[in-house]
Amino acid sequence: MPVGFRWVRGHVRADRALVERFAAVPVAIVSDNMNRMFAGGADLRPMHACEGGGGGLAGTALTVLTRPGDNLVIHKAIDVAEPGDVIVVDAGGDTTSAVVGELIARHAQVCGVAGFVINGAIRDLDAFRAGSFPIFATGVTHRGPYK
């Protein structure tokens, strides 16, 4: 595999009506019906304010595979995301450097991204806790990303 990044175009989008119906299904039920495979695992936690049972997330997944601490392709994902997309990031589960912080999340929100699911770290936790933009991650660190 060559060094660098690749972008695969033309992914199939989920029907919006189906996404809206799916959003009402509890995540535990979804996990059970997937034979408990392909779910986030015990380390994945909501990092946003979700008191009162809110803060769920459903949408077409725009997936990103990146090196720990590298958020260049996440910027690209935000640029090509359509309103309602969920950006799902696999940063290898590394929590030494964040791949998303307050500024990139605000940019994503303005662009219509529904939220993030990150196998890796975020930073600026206080900003996420003060808001309701859905972001789930496996860790928090003060160390920022690099591009």
Model-found features: residue ranges?
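Feature captures the catalytic cores and cofactor-binding loops of soluble hydro-lyases/lyases
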Residues: 1-147
